[in-house]
Design a protein with these regions (language model features):
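Beta-strand-rich modules
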Residues: 1-4
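A structural signal for beta-strand boundary/capping segments at domain termini and interdomain linkers
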Residues: 6-10
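Extracellular ligand-binding/catalytic regions of CAZymes and related secreted enzymes
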Residues: 13-102, 114, 181, 194, ...
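Helical hinge/lid and interdomain linker segments adjacent to catalytic or ligand-binding clefts
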Residues: 69-201
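Alpha-helix initiation/capping motif
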Residues: 123-125, 130, 165, 231-235, ...
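A short acidic, often aromatic-flanked loop/helix-cap motif at beta-alpha or helix-coil junctions
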Residues: 127-133, 221-227, 277, 298
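A glycine-rich, often tryptophan-bearing local segment used as a flexible ligand/cofactor-contacting loop or short
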Residues: 147-255, 266, 273, 307
Length: 317
């Protein structure tokens, strides 16, 4: 607050010291994206493809009224609103749509503390710049949410919001080479490294060598349900539900990733209930657990606490 008024809310970080802690986790918020939905313009089609990437509002959106259903450029001059280029549904006309609330370290942290671990948190920029180091922490929980390489406006400034920047990759490589443990979750953890606007061979090698997964497709599921399928004794055989529809208090997960284990000892932990595609991959030898949907999108507090306990105990046993 100053003479110019009140500034916009900033990113929220959190910390907690637990008595008789099992260890200390560094929670890194790598989800700072705010953007419009994916837009496409070709010779005959143009519009917003919200089922692939519905964009990320800044906390809340009151302008979205429904998904576009007319993309045909030949309808650009049509005078009938319902069938003209850009026509969309009106089923969310009076609804508030949830977006990025920039406070996910606190939400993750509550589950970390419930599992008996202390935690600190930092922005991904602080980690990339070397202001915060993961060295000395028992594990790192990297929040990626709906982060993905995205053009801003007309795209004249290039891409922003890459999931794993070269700087972050370098930090995580060093940390994992020193025996670290890493939990990663997000909708585009594989899509962005394989088909994103800035994807490279180095990105794919990083995913395979450090994170121990490969890409098995986007838009992997529509029903918002995953089930633990591994026989590993460290994981509870539960079903989890994540937010897959528009709500005022949570962002929607419209296009989760399907993963495939990579490297010796990597295995599937979770599968999407509707089709059996892999939703979560773990590597005991590599010290990683990666999910193709965001941890914070799991609806139930009890389910989040249970999953975080299982993940940390698996990584740090």
């Amino acid at each position: 607050m100053n003479e110019g008024g009140e500034s916009f809310p900033s990113e929220t970080v959190a910390a907690c010291r637990m008595p008789d802690e099992k260890g200390t986790v560094l929670i890194v918020n790598g989800f700072d994206r705010v953007s419009a939905p994916l837009s496409v313009r070709a010779d005959s089609l143009a519009g917003f493809y919200t089922d692939i990437d519905g964009g990320v509002p800044d906390r809340q959106d009151i302008s979205f009224i429904g998904a576009q259903h007319v993309f045909d450029m030949q309808m650009a001059k049509c005078e009938v609103d319902s069938i003209a280029l850009g026509a969309c549904a009106c089923d969310y006309e009076t609804e508030v749509i949830g977006g990025n609330t920039f406070d996910y370290p606190a939400l993750h942290g509550r589950s970390v503390a419930a599992a008996g671990y202390s935690f600190c948190s930092a922005s991904v920029r602080a980690v990339e710049r070397g202001e915060v180091s993961p060295d000395g922490y028992s594990a790192v929980d990297l929040i990626l949410g709906e982060q993905r390489s995205t053009t801003i406006g007309r795209g004249v400034t290039g891409y922003a919001f890459k999931t794993f920047s070269p700087e972050l990759q370098a930090v995580l490589r060093r940390y994992m080479a020193g025996g670290g443990a890493l939990f990663v979750s997000g909708s585009y953890v594989a899509t962005d490294l394989w088909t994103g606007g800035e994807a490279s061979d180095d990105d794919r090698r990083f995913a395979e060598e450090v994170l121990h997964y490969t890409y098995d497709g986007s838009r992997a599921a529509q029903r918002g349900r995953v089930r633990v399928v591994t026989s590993h004794p460290g994981f509870s055989r539960d079903e989890y539900r994540y937010v897959n529809e528009y709500r005022p208090d949570r962002y929607r997960v419209e296009s989760p990733d399907a993963l495939r284990p990579a490297g010796a000892g990597a295995f599937s932990v979770m599968r999407y209930v509707e089709n059996g595609r892999t939703a979560g991959v773990a590597s005991e030898a590599g010290g990683t657990f990666v999910m193709g949907f965001p941890f914070e999108s799991i609806e139930s507090d009890v389910q989040r606490d249970r999953l975080m306990r299982d993940v940390l105990d698996f990584l740090l046993k």
